Amino acid sequence: VYKEMPDSPYMQEPYLGTYYYLLNTLVPPTDNLNVRKALSMAVDRDKLNATVLKGTNISAYSITPPDTLGYYPPKLFSYDPDRARELLAEAGYPNGEGWPGLELTYNTSEDHRKIAVALQQMWKDVLNIDVALTNQEWKVYLDSVTNMHFQIARRGWIGDYVDPNNFL
């Protein structure tokens, strides 16, 4: 209602939080740095936001949201499908050959499912790898993540206060 009023006091700021995927570095194949980099570089975050999330979010390139007290994180792993394929080949899986499989775990939510499906498709299209999706109810999901029973898990961090240190 306020948003539609002339001279409205309504103001909307970006969400002080980041949703991301946690990769378990203790189990293969995500124990390999090149695999982790390849997975990251094979994700078109801007396309994901524009299509799956209908432009309602800011693409995350860092755990710290942009403009958190003037902090602008660098885009360390931008979308780079060619480099992603090179890194996967360096890890021993050229064009996805010999890929041992991978499982992405997320908690029950239609948006989480849509994002997981989009990632699964991007990884298939760019890297030619298969990724299984596992949906878990909240308590089961928390137990899986707490006990490190996952390869990739959906995570999030919501800031307690507006300062980049809150995300470190």
Segments predicted by a language model, with ranges:
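Extracellular/periplasmic solute-recognition and catalytic clefts
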Residues: 1-27, 50
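Extracellular/periplasmic catalytic domains that process cell-envelope and extracellular macromolecules
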Residues: 3, 14-16, 95-98, 146-148, ...
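Periplasmic binding protein-like
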Residues: 9, 122-168
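Append "and occasionally in soluble cytosolic enzymes with long acidic Gly/Pro-rich linkers
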Residues: 10, 30-121, 125
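Residues at the C-termini of beta-strands that transition into short coil/loop
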Residues: 14-16, 67, 137, 156
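Envelope-exposed proteins and targeting segments
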Residues: 17-19, 100, 127
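Extracytoplasmic/secreted cell-surface and envelope-processing proteins
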Residues: 21, 31-32, 112-114, 143, ...
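Conserved short loop/turn motifs at secondary-structure junctions
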Residues: 25-26, 104-110, 135-138
